[in-house]
Each structure stands twice: as C-alpha cells, then as structure tokens.
C-alpha cells in the first residue's frame, strides 16, 4: 500500500540518498567558536559561572597556602613577600573575580527567564562585559608572572603602601589596571540588567509581581553604578601617582585618608553587591521547599530597598581607628542597617514557619546560610560599636566576622542556587547524596576554620602577619583552624565529582518543574529552555505564575481569597454556572 504524495522514481532515489547521509557531528572548533561569539544570555551566564568558580578554586588554594604557613610558628613554606602576595590576591580574587561575577552569572541565566524576556536588552554588550571581566582579571592575576611578583599591599591597596616607592613592581600596576578593566565590565553588565528589568518584562508582570531575585538584581545593579565608578576613578588616580607623579594620595596632603574614603565608599556597597543577589537566591529556594508563598513579599522588597539605600552611608565604619571620621553617625547607621536585614530573616523564618518543609539539598544549603549569616551578623553588631572595635580592629576577629558574612552568604547561596537551578541549566538533576556530603563537609570545615579565629582575634592575634611566636599562645588554635580549612577545601571535590557524574550519567528530567512547587516563571519553560526561552507565556496574575500554571486549583482558591466582594461573587457565580 502506498502513501499519498510518496515520492516516486528519481525523486524517491534522491530522497533515499539524502536520508542515508550521515548526521553532521559537532566539531570541537565549531563549539569553541560558538562559545566565543555567543550572545545568548544563558551561554554567557554559564561562562560567568564557570569562570568565577575557577577563580574561587584558585583563591581557595591561596587560602590553604596561607593556613598551612600559619599552622605552626616559624616560616614553613612561604617567604613573607610571598605571603603578602597570597593574601592580597586571595582577597582580590574572592571579592572581585569570584563573588561579583558569580552574581552576573546567576543574573544572566535566571533573570530574563523570570521576567519572561527572550534575552537581555543588549546581548552584544553583555558579551563584551564578560570579556572585559575575564581579561581584566587575567591581567591582575598575571602579576605573578612578573619578576617582582604580584601586588602585595593588600586587596584594599592602602596608600602610601601602594605608591611607587613602597611597591615598585609591575605587578602592582597590572593589579590596578586589571581591576579597572574588570570593573568596566561589571558596570556595563549592570546597565544591561537594569534596562532589561525595566523594559522587557512580560505582559502582566508589574514591578510588584517580579520575583524577589529580580528585585535584588535590579537594586544590585543600581549599587554597582554608584560604587564601581568611584573605584575606577580612585584606581586611575593611584596609577597617575605611580607613573606621572600626580601626588593625589600623598600622605603629607592627607592622601592616605582620601584613598580610604574613596576605596571604602566602593568597598562597603560592594559587600551588598555580593550579598543582595544571594539573598535573592535564598528567597527563591525557601518558599519552594516550604510549600508556601513568601511570607511578607512587600516587606521583603522594602527591606531590600532599605539595605541598598543604607549601604552607601556606612563606609567609614572601616575607618574607626583612623581618628578622622564622625564615630556616632557611622556607628548609628551601621546599627541601623541591621534592622532591614533582621526583617529579611523574619520573612524567611516566617515562610518556613508551619510550612511543609522538605530538606532537599538546595534547602539544606539555604538553612546553612541562615545559621552562618546569623553568626556573622552578631559579630557585626560588636564591630559596629567603636569602643569594642578599637580592641579587635585589624585582628583575626575581623577576619572571622567578614568570612562568616561573605562566605556564609555567597558560597552557601551559590551551592543552593546550583542545586536548585541545575535542572534548568542542564536538564539533569545533581545527585542528592553527593550534594549532602558536600554540604556537611563544607559546613563543618567552615565553622571549624573561622569560629576559632574569633578567639584568636580576641586574644590579640593581628591579621596579615606571616608568622607569630610560640610564646604568643596562638599555636593550638591556629593548628585546629588549619586542619579544618583543609576539610573545607576537600569539600569541593564531591561537588566536582557530582557535576561530572551528572553530566555523564544523569537522566533528563523531562518536565518543566522537577521540584513540583516552583513559583517563578523560569519553571514554566523546558529544562533547559529553548534559544529564546519561551514558546508560550502563561498568564501572569500573581508573583507565582509558574505555580498558578501547574496548580490551577490552588491559584483559584488564592484568587478567591484575595478578591474583593464583587470579584468573589463573580468567581462564585462562574463556579455555579460551571455546575
């Protein structure tokens, strides 16, 4: 029996010949060119995530070298100069080459999906921003290849330590210009994010239907535009001092304090630039695994706006011991910024309260974040008080505090986001057992490393020192901290194995929302999404459009609960008519 319109004769032979042609395989060169020239926000997001994670591993190795040096008194494996280079580049890498671009990676991948956009507003600018970040970072790190080594004046580059007399090497110039280069990429990326959020939201997505993560990306972008131009100006002025004798930061003219004001006016908003997006990730994860909508959605947005506003008023709390700042004002503003942060915790815990909690790996990391960040916040209250700060400033107490705050936010939320969105990134789920092994080894290793450093700081151990005396009494605590730091470092290995195992043996999820209770719009498209993200967009009538799509009966109940009297009558009348 023949099929209608089946080709006959020569046409059939030609068709048969075409069907027998081998399928063209992907050539490695084609794949490389595609990745190097892509303007797809998802691919660019992947590049940001992979590159920033690679820098995370490099910065972690430097941290382990420093901890190995400090395990016992005396110089073990590094000279003092090498130690200075290690702690300078460790801080620079972790803050400006890992945490900041990690935000750009998650924002690139997830934000356009959550607002129903086909891409970002300026795709080519997006790619240009990534290359600025990559090459700027490589220039800064490339100082290790120069005869005098990398920058060694601390990641904050205090003047006059960073001038041409005290830091004459080319590595310092590469650090300055590399960070300026990378910072331009961050600025351009933030312009892109703000424009995309303002101009490219799907029909029905008002500002107060946007996911919390999108709100946080928007406010982070605003902070970048406030902070990074100040850093760029300060870096160019410092380079002018070094190369052209500009005398901007001469100590005789008050330049040392001027540098600190400029740098920390960037530096403290930077803390929230690397905190707010990761608060947003936690705000996406907790409702899904609590089986509840976010408690206090409007209050959470208000708290985020308050944190962003207050973050540019507290920079001089890094400068209490200089004697050149108004202590009551900056102390009060620092205490004040704890209030909206407390509101956020109230919202997160309120969402979990009486929820149907499910501790899959993303929720486990989110819970670890809540515990760790709380510890960091408590020590922050101590440091906000000038009389107490005077005693522990520049000690390991400060090191412990900011690692609890920064690591507790960025790394815990990063792993939570990886496990939560991995099926959206790749179409496959990461292994739960390996994820929990990673969590517990990292959790124990982290707290063992840094909890002890509070006590070291209280006993008077200064930060940035390459050595100490056996008579100082710091040996036992330093040894414990170093052992736990290597456990922390080893915790990354199960995650890397998990990624490899999932890529090679993982089964495709086959559904839009493998978690079953996803609320935001990225869970209303396939895993992974098509090139322009959506084939069709669901109706957006709340801040949980994907949940409304997959659970229409609950959405109808919510609509009835939140409707006015006239709307309730209409809904009820429609139900009766349906019967």
UniProtKB/Swiss-Prot annotation:
Cu cation binds at residues 268, 272, 317-318. Fe(II)-heme a binds at residues 90, 403. It comes from the Bacteria. InterPro entries: Cyt_c_oxase-like_su1_dom, Cyt_c_oxase-like_su1_sf, Cyt_C_Oxase_1, Cyt_c_Oxase_su1_BS, Cyt_c_oxidase_su1_bac. Pfam families: COX1. One of its GO terms (biological process) is electron transport coupled proton transport. Cytochrome c oxidase is the component of the respiratory chain that catalyzes the reduction of oxygen to water. Subunits 1-3 form the functional core of the enzyme complex. CO I is the catalytic subunit of the enzyme. Electrons originating in cytochrome c are transferred via the copper A center of subunit 2 and heme A of subunit 1 to the bimetallic center formed by heme A3 and copper B. This is Probable cytochrome c oxidase subunit 1-alpha. It comes from Streptomyces avermitilis (strain ATCC 31267 / DSM 46492 / JCM 5070 / NBRC 14893 / NCIMB 12804 / NRRL 8165 / MA-4680).
